[in-house]
Amino acid sequence: PIAETDDAGTVHDRLMAIGAALVVETVDRIIDHDGHVETTEQESLTTDTAPLRDAPKIFRDTCHIDWCQPTERVYNFIRGLAPYPAAWTEILSADGRRMALKVFRSERIAEPHALSPGAIRTDGRRHLDVATEDGFLRLLDVQPAGKRRMTADQFLNGTDVSACCMA
């Protein structure tokens, strides 16, 4: 099962290990049965009657975070794109400057508010919370454009976001 804190990277790594073990098991069965292995039609493994579709190509704009969505949806959007290609947003300063920010990890805060989606709530040192439609997301791991990945408190040590919002 996929845990609440898993992201695409952790699921990928787990499936990679399962796949490697399955390859070894399959080769062992082929050897044990003189090259004969019972096959299974792939169609028999699905129970849904809807046709399968190809996954859409992911572009940079596809990865942009829409803070007007419910907290759960934004949280899952970030998890689904982490660690690569990574969800991103822009920090809009009071003077109109924009800074791209990739978001790798966050946590949900179920707290009603009257703030606009994308509004930033911070203590300036450790917590970087962004308002969503129905709560907040606390950003935990981020990467400013042109810099390395860092924790939110490391980011806040060098960046004043008190008069900023997310775009």
Protein language model annotation of sequence segments:
Residues 1-109:
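Active-site-proximal loop/hinge segments within enzyme catalytic domains
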Residues 62-167:
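An anion-binding loop in the catalytic cleft
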